[in-house]
Regions:
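Conserved short submotifs of the Hanks-type protein kinase catalytic core
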Residues: 77-93, 97
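Conserved catalytic-loop aspartate of Hanks-type protein kinases
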Residues: 193
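Conserved activation segment of eukaryotic-like protein kinases, specifically the C-terminal portion
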Residues: 168-182
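Protein kinase catalytic-loop region centered on the HRD/HxD motif
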Residues: 121-135
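Activation segment signature within eukaryotic-like protein kinase domains
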Residues: 116-117
Length: 229
């Protein structure tokens, strides 16, 4: 499998790196198209979790969600490694976009804020109704929203996604953007994603000047928030 992967793809550059994963920009040698390769290794539990999530979202077909082209296992020397091949988005994160547009006295128009907000709501409508059960993203934030070179919104990073009917409690998400129930480990619900989109809209309206919850973990924040639902 290791040789087959490298026979098909040329690694262009490393995009990011963490303890158990590396993300690369790669080029398909035959099709001559760029894609993203996410390679996870060194932790069997994490690899199994990510593989399960990849299978959860592999059949999603929506213009604002990156396509998953392939899922491979054991591409390296580590038998627990997996690789997810995804659509490459040539663009910038919403956080970078807002910073660029509002820097040096610039302005993000109401029309643009509404356009991005509507596209995010269209994504949620699709995800929450997918296959009758729905899929919850559970980590919507400016860093997980991309705008391609044409300005089209793309929602990325489904690492925390769960099936809508799973009835699972969640303690994941990003401070400031996670809904109150995520802080206290309650059941995942569609409203959690809606809350996060609302916080993203606030981020745009305030031109990125909203306070974060740095220094606070999810478990320590419930006392500072009232339940909204």
């Amino acid at each position: 499998m290791y040789n087959e992967f490298y026979d098909r793809y040329e690694i262009i550059r490393e995009l990011s790196c963490s303890r158990h994963s590396k993300v690369y920009l790669v080029r398909h040698r035959i099709l001559d198209v760029y894609r993203v390769a996410k390679i996870f290794s060194g932790n069997q539990y994490e690899a199994d979790r990510l593989l399960k999530e990849a299978h959860l979202i592999k059949n999603l077909k929506h213009p604002h969600i990156p396509v998953i082209y392939d899922i491979e296992q054991n591409i390296g020397e580590d038998n627990s490694s997996i690789c997810i091949i995804e659509e490459y988005i040539d663009g910038k994160s919403l956080r970078q976009y807002v910073n660029d547009e509002t820097g040096a006295g610039g302005n993000l128009s109401v029309h643009e804020i509404c356009r991005i907000g509507v596209e995010l709501c269209c994504i949620l409508e699709y995800l929450h109704g997918f296959n009758g059960n729905g899929i919850l993203h559970m980590d919507i934030k400016p860093d997980n929203i991309m705008l391609d070179i044409n300005g089209k919104v793309k929602l990325i990073d489904f690492d925390n996604a769960v099936a809508g009917n799973a009835g699972v409690s969640v303690d994941s998400g990003s401070p400031l953007y996670a809904a109150p129930e995520q802080y206290s480990g309650e059941y995942a619900v569609t409203q959690s994603d809606v809350y996060s989109v609302g916080m993203v809209i606030l981020f745009m309206v305030s031109h990125g000047h909203i306070k974060t919850d740095k220094g606070h973990n999810l478990a320590g924040i419930p006392r500072r928030y009232s339940r909204l639902y």
